[in-house]
């Protein structure tokens, strides 16, 4: 497979930290998981430093910056505190996500269209510092257009509605969500944006998304950490890598 065709896999290690924090202490170590993910074929590592520090910690981000040989995709809310942390560490990529303290996981995409001026000023220093700025959004044309206007280089399309419809057996809705994702990936690519996708992807749902030629990167975490309980982290990631590559071939 040529480098041009290869789809990148970003492995999100947040929920290794979730398990660690359930008991306190240092085990299991997210940094060890990140190194295993690299060995298993991950092209990058994603970590979300939430405002409430419910899983990934500041020390984890510092450690990842020190040990990784692949790029770090630093997920964060659009707050002054997170901006300062990102500017201090200067990770390869920063993905701006919506965040609510009461949610279990990121429930939807960022409302870029409603906050264009604020977000444009927020991401400017990050871009000047050399970080690639990505915006996590719903597959909606108005959000994509707004992300483009504020100067984002990358968008990440929220695949949760597609994955949820598949899990619920609503295949008509699943197919409609898949078509919407495909159309919006094509639209974003036409604007010159780099297109990523993620949220809720599993072995059963990854290949239709991986087959979109406009999508350059998938970010997958919760499923892989869960599957690692049964088959081990390296084999779980290697199987996802295999499915992605097969869909792209």
Curated annotation (Swiss-Prot):
Active site per the UniProt annotation: 48 (proton acceptor), 75 (proton acceptor), 199 (proton donor)
Reaction(s) the record says it catalyses: 3-amino-2-oxopropyl phosphate + 1-deoxy-D-xylulose 5-phosphate = pyridoxine 5'-phosphate + phosphate + 2 H2O + H(+)
Entry EC number(s): 2.6.99.2
Pathway: Cofactor biosynthesis; pyridoxine 5'-phosphate biosynthesis; pyridoxine 5'-phosphate from D-erythrose 4-phosphate: step 5/5
Site, as annotated: Transition state stabilizer: 156
Gene Ontology molecular function, alphabetical: pyridoxine 5'-phosphate synthase activity
GO cellular component, one term: cytosol
Enzyme class: transferase
UniProt family annotation: Belongs to the PNP synthase family.
Protein name: Pyridoxine 5'-phosphate synthase
